[in-house]
Regions:
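Helix-hairpin-helix/helix-loop-helix acidic hairpins
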Residues: 102-156, 165, 232-235
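Phosphate-backbone recognition surface of nucleic-acid-processing proteins
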Residues: 146-149, 155, 159-248, 252
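Generic structural signal for well-ordered, non-transmembrane alpha-helical segments
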Residues: 62, 69, 121-128, 261
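Phosphate- and other anionic-substrate recognition elements at nucleic-acid/protein interfaces
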Residues: 1-105, 233, 254
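Leucine-rich amphipathic alpha-helices with coiled-coil/heptad-repeat character
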Residues: 68, 75, 79-82, 86, ...
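Short alpha-helical scaffolding segments that buttress acidic/His motifs in well-ordered protein cores
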Residues: 36, 58, 113, 161, ...
Length: 287
């Protein structure tokens, strides 16, 4: 590393040249050198170790949350497979657990359901412990209180946001941040120009929007879309922003995406400026 002028960490998905032709260490090095010379490599951010502890704690909490969801799904699938109605959250609670187990007639099936309940209790205990540890670590960051001031972002979502973004200055604009969070639009267009009476004119054909970008950080997308969903059903300045979009004729699902983009943009701006949330941001900044 003493003789290296610059270290570039690049996205291997975009190095299509490496897939063509023969492959060896020498050939790959030559192709990478050609891509670097032509400025065709796509650099990605390789963060520092300052948030390493929080990142691991967030990953632990997220994994345990996913495990909890899976166990709950298996438990309800067991009841549904025997035509037992199990809507809502009652099948998971300890108060009526014996009543649910008594509805299962087969001894082997009842034993399986009991094992799932034991597994659910154990994972929920671990998840609560992981959550406490994650929140305790996130409180050490000065930006934590600033981001928590944004309505419906909350302690857990703020912890995930800090761990995944690390530093806000890696995103020069909010549109770059939207793309990283899976909130950017993917468009397709062709035949943009045509000849009319010998003159080249731009076609009036509208740009085809395919939807939100697929290559993104899924945790951050869940953070902002979850906050937008909560804000759209509770009173507050964000709900007013959402209602104004509905009044303009925008569909509810598109209005929620717009609200998620707004929350993401505010989080990035407040993080960079070191300021707390002010409802005036909803009026001064364009969505």
């Amino acid at each position: 590393m003493q003789h290296v002028a610059e270290v570039v960490v690049c996205n291997p998905r975009k190095n299509a040249l490496l897939k063509a032709g023969n492959k060896s260490d020498q050939i790959d090095a030559r192709k990478l050198a050609e891509l670097l010379r032509a400025d065709l490599l796509s650099p990605v951010y390789h963060g520092e170790n300052s948030t390493r502890i929080l990142k691991e704690l967030v990953r632990s909490y997220s994994t345990l949350t996913e495990d909890t969801t899976r166990i709950m799904g298996r438990l309800k699938a067991l009841y549904r497979s025997h035509a037992i109605s199990c809507a809502g959250k009652k099948p998971y609670g300890k108060r009526h657990r014996q009543e649910w187990l008594q509805q299962v007639q087969q001894p082997g099936l009842a034993s399986r359901a009991q094992r799932l309940y034991d597994q659910l209790d154990a994972v929920q205990t671990l998840r609560r412990a992981a959550k406490r540890e994650m929140l305790a670590e996130s409180h050490k960051y000065s930006v934590y209180r600033l981001l928590c001031s944004i309505p419906y972002l909350g302690p857990v979502r703020t912890s995930i946001l800090i761990a995944r973004v690390q530093v806000p200055n890696r995103f020069r604009t909010k549109r770059q941040f939207w793309a990283y969070c899976g909130l950017a639009l993917e468009t397709r267009n062709s035949a943009e120009y045509r000849f009319v009476k010998g003159q080249l004119q731009r076609s009036k054909k509208p740009v085809f929007i395919r939807g939100l970008n697929l290559n993104h950080n899924h945790d951050l997308k869940n953070v902002f879309k979850g906050a937008a969903t909560a804000a759209s059903i509770h009173d507050g300045p964000l709900r007013q922003f959402y209602d104004r979009r509905l009044a303009k004729g925008i569909k509810p699902e598109l209005a929620r995406v717009t609200l998620a983009r707004k929350i993401a943009a505010m989080a990035l701006i407040l993080w960079k400026k070191g300021e707390s949330f002010d409802p005036q941001y909803l009026m001064s900044q364009a969505a």
